[in-house]
Amino acid sequence: GQQPLCNDCFACARSLCICGDLVPQCHEGCQQCEKVDTLSGKPLYQCRSFEDYQCAN
């Protein structure tokens, strides 16, 4: 499916983007996101292309 462009997120990690919006969005260092299944059932989006970027929680 289509991979959305990433904009802003409220929590960032080296390779993960944790998004608070229904549409997956990451900080500007992340180029693309893909949804990852988790045991908790909470939506988790992994950054396919990641550039080092300081992101405050």
Curated annotation (Swiss-Prot):
Expressed in bulb (at protein level). One of its GO terms (molecular function) is serine-type endopeptidase inhibitor activity. The keyword Methyltransferase does not apply. It comes from the Eukaryota. The keyword Disulfide bond applies. GO terms for biological process: negative regulation of endopeptidase activity. Disulfide bonds join C6-C55, C12-C17, C26-C33, C30-C47. Gene3D superfamilies: Cysteine Protease (Bromelain) Inhibitor, subunit H. GO terms for cellular component: extracellular region. Keywords: Disulfide bond, Protease inhibitor, Serine protease inhibitor. The record marks R14, S15 as: Reactive bond for trypsin. Serine protease inhibitor. Inhibits trypsin (Ki = 110 nM) and very weakly inhibits chymotrypsin (Ki =1200 nM). Does not inhibit bacterial subtilisin. Belongs to the Bowman-Birk serine protease inhibitor family. This is Bowman-Birk type proteinase inhibitor B4.
